[in-house]
Amino acid sequence: MKLKIAILGTRGIPNYYGGFEHISEYVSAGLVKKGHSVTVYNSHNHPYEADTWNGVNIVHCYDPEYLIGTAGQFAYDFNCLMDARKRKFDVVLLMGYTSSSVWGHLYPSNSVIITNMDGLEWKRSKYSKPVQQFLKYAEKLAVKHSQYYISDSRVIRSYLKDKYEVDSRYIPYGADLFSDQEREQFDKSEVLKEDYFLLMARMEPENNIETILEGFNNSSSKKSFMVLGDTSNRFGKFITHRFKNDDRIQFKGANFDNSVVRALQNNSYLYFHGHSVGGTNPSLLEAMASEALIAAHNNPFNKSVLNSDAFYFDNANEVRHLVENVQRKDTEREMVKNNLHKIQYQFNWEVVINDYEDFILECYQQQHGKVIKA
């Protein structure tokens, strides 16, 4: 028996935005290949306007975020839920809860509700105290109104168990291995191999960009430091202004060409990953898959993925030490190799898609008492 599955909570596919869109793109297409009927809800503002994508049905719902800001996300999620209630899906998979769980009483009663519980959004320092309090409340509502839960990090799974006494299925993101084709696409005349440090992140305080660049700024390194990320927001403008006098630091803006990003990661001397909040971060997995040597912020989320196969830092002083002292020798090459092995066997998209299907079928069977053959 194959199921009728809906995926809500993202801006839509194909991915032009971020983590949940990224995984929804892979999982939806993968489930279709396994014979399921899958519908993904897209914002009406999404650049992709067709009604199907790689066999996935696309429903375009009105999204007023462009008119009224963040409040529009709540209206968009409401519109998606109202449509989903009419379509009698077997399973509704909600990616996140920040603007949907307030509508939990409207979740389709005839569908099995599974929520991917996101990464402790209320901890993000970019949010004001009232917003952080609301996000805690939204998390509580998501637990209350969902029947089953997915955690993309073992840290999140432990948190949900300790905080709410609920079990969740650990299913991480995936990544594709760095291909020979991608290597060939990289123009080596643009950047000298291993002659630069690299950071790629949204310009937000919790991504420790200031700490990383301060450490580099205080170093004696003769290498350059490339920063990939949109600097047009308030924090981005602050960062570019603060380090404008260091000619070694190059702000390259946002780059959504995956092959270019992966080539830059692969060729970097050391890739800095400063994310401190959230589950399994897709950009970290991409760096691992791209065979980058990684220095990561010292926190449970990053350590649960990288273990001992990375350098860690807590402050600018430790960043400076890494910049001035890390060598590319046998031990470092072994770290890169071990991370690549993790991508092949733990964070492989085929494994992730299979885990999603297994869990969805298991949840449906538990709810309906039916034996289902995948």
Predicted region positions:
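N-terminal strand-loop element at the rim of the active site
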Residues: 2-3, 10-16, 30-68, 155-157, ...
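Conserved donor-binding/catalytic core segment of Leloir-type glycosyltransferases
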Residues: 6, 189-207, 213-220, 225-226
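Glycosyltransferase donor-sugar binding loop
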Residues: 46, 200, 223-237, 250-254
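An aromatic- and histidine-rich active-site surface loop
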Residues: 72-85, 89-117, 279
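Membrane-proximal helix-turn-helix segments that form the acceptor-binding/catalytic region
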Residues: 82, 131-149
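Aromatic "clamp/platform" in nucleotide-sugar-dependent glycosyltransferases that forms part
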Residues: 275-276
